[in-house]
Amino acid sequence: MIQVIIQPGSIQVAGHAGAGPPGYDLVCAAVSTLVQTFVRSAEQLTDTQLHSDIAPGGAFVRYEESPQVQLLADSFFVGVQGVAEAYPQCVQVLDRRERRAEALTAEKQGRYSPNE
């Protein structure tokens, strides 16, 4: 199983989906693509300092929080959550960003709209 942990200023990915043979696992490929897109987008589209260590079976990304990078991190979260919903036996996502948890709680209570 792939475990994705999203925290303020960092993303960690560890494990293998086990949904296919090495090199042919579409779930691993999807998560890897999302991680690499986040890193490349943050590096090329923002002025934020970023450190990444990406290797087979895992990735660790640490970044300075800014509105631009937060939007990219939110986009990464949406994508990886979609993969986890489609393949719950292969991917687990833990969102430990306080701001995100508060926003979801407020949205459920009708106090927050993502468009605000």
Predicted regions: what is each one?
Residues 1-26, 33-116:
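N-terminal intrinsically disordered, cationic/polar leader segments
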